[in-house]
């Protein structure tokens, strides 16, 4: 057995549910989340990287997930031609006014907008950290966050306010050495 295999097994046994939930938040689809997690694991463990601890391996896989989501979105996907295939366009006004849950609303964003929103409000990263993480300019990240916030506010209702001063992190600070 290769040196990395026990660590991969430990990541899958202990950390997979958390990583899968994170991938599902970014993809909006449980099946695609499984594929994204698998791709992120392959990227993380196939390049001969040496991880000293399961926390380090999990952090690397977690960091790879948004990149995998964006890369997968670049692949060809058929574009529906029938307006009925666009529920956000073809739905009657009463349906559009119904409250949507956050996961459904996130699906309406582009992959990059979704990644920026999740990294900002779920992972509590700063704009510059998101830019470094995704390989984008700070201004580009700000634009994605602005566009996505406006879209989410429209989808979730007028009383949703994603301005910085009105948000709180959804994750508690981790104790040193734990992740």
What is the role of each PLM region?
Residues 1-21, 31:
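A short, charge-rich alpha-helical start-of-domain segment used by transcription regulators
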Residues 29, 110, 126, 135-140:
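Helix-turn-helix DNA-binding motif, specifically the short coil turn and the N-cap/start of the second
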Residues 116-120:
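A short pre-motif secondary-structure segment
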Residues 35-42, 46, 55-67:
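Structural recognition of an alpha-helix C-terminal capping motif at a helix-to-coil junction
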Residues 6, 10, 78-79, 83-107:
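Acidic, proline/glycine-rich intrinsically disordered inter-domain spacer in sigma factors
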Residues 19, 23, 33-44, 130, ...:
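Short, small-hydrophobic-rich alpha-helical interface motif
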Residues 66, 70, 134-162, 170:
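DNA-recognition helix of helix-turn-helix
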Residues 46, 52, 63-84, 95:
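Arg/Lys-rich amphipathic alpha helix in sigma70-family domain 2
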């Amino acid at each position: 057995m290769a040196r990395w295999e026990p660590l991969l097994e430990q990541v899958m046994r202990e950390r997979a549910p958390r990583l899968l939930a994170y991938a599902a938040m970014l993809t909006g689809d449980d099946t695609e989340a499984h594929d994204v997690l698998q791709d992120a694991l392959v990227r993380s463990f196939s390049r001969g990287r040496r991880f000293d601890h399961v926390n380090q391996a999990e952090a690397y896989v977690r960091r790879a997930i948004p990149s995998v989501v964006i890369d997968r979105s670049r692949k060809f996907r058929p574009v529906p031609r029938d307006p009925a295939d666009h529920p956000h366009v073809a739905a009657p006004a009463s349906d559009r006014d119904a409250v949507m849950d956050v996961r459904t609303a996130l699906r309406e964003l582009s992959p990059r907008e979704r990644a920026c929103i999740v990294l900002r409000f779920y992972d509590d990263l700063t704009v510059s950290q998101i830019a470094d993480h995704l390989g984008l300019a700070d201004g580009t990240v700000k634009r994605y966050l602005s566009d996505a916030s406006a879209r989410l506010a429209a989808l979730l209702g007028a009383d949703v306010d994603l301005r910085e001063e009105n948000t709180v992190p959804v994750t508690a600070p981790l104790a040193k050495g734990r992740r």
